[in-house]
Amino acid sequence: MRLLEERILAEGTVLGETILKVDQFLTHQVDYRLMKEIGRVFADQYADLGITKVVTIEASGIAPAVYTAEALEVPMIFAKKHKNITMTEGILTAEVYSFTKQVTSTVSIAGGLLSKEDRVLIIDDFLANGQAAKGLIDIIQQAGAKAVGIGIVIEKSFQAGRQLLEDLGVEVTSLARIKHFDNGTVSFLEADA
């Protein structure tokens, strides 16, 4: 997605050899126009798969996920990183390691929000090692539902996440695919959409 790549080049900041900071439009401040376009592109990409729910993990995946759900006209669910007192029965959980935060979290979705009839599109802001999406696939399968696609806003293609998810049999669509970081600059591979 050329527009996204342009924003990364103009406003993204490379930190070290593996981190891209995109606080200006995705991970802290949200550019709703860009997110709306991202949602439209994901919806177009997966329009023929009978998606019934969009699922993400809080927090930075919520904006692109909600705009994707809007474009598909389906509900959006976000997995919570902290259990609250209203989540009492039938909670679906998975352990997820965050590459950026370097911490393992238990993420959860309340029972009853997913069913065996659901065809789920996973949306996330970044793909690095694939652990967040893998955890969501686990939760979706616990409900008897089917993960039919994974939409990634920014993929770090130099890390193993895509291969892990494709090995699980789920199609991955990334709107920006980073080949590598070199002296603070970003090099891209061809995006999927």
Swiss-Prot record:
Q: Which SUPFAM superfamilies match?
A: PRTase-like
Family classification? Belongs to the purine/pyrimidine phosphoribosyltransferase family. Xpt subfamily.
Q: What is its main location?
A: cytoplasm
What InterPro entries does this protein's entry cite? PRibTrfase_dom, PRTase-like, Pur/Pyrimidine_PRTase, Xanthine_PRibTrfase
Keywords noted in UniProt: Cytoplasm, Glycosyltransferase, Purine salvage, Transferase
* Source organism: Streptococcus equi subsp. zooepidemicus (strain H70)
What are the GO BP annotations of this UniProt entry?
purine ribonucleoside salvage; xanthine metabolic process; XMP salvage
Tell me what this protein is called.
Xanthine phosphoribosyltransferase
Q: Where in the cell is it found?
A: Cytoplasm
Subunit record text: Homodimer.
Q: Which GO terms describe its molecular function?
A: xanthine phosphoribosyltransferase activity
Which EC number(s) are documented for this chain? 2.4.2.22
**One GO term of the cellular component aspect?**
cytoplasm
Q: Where does xanthine bind?
A: L20, T27, K156
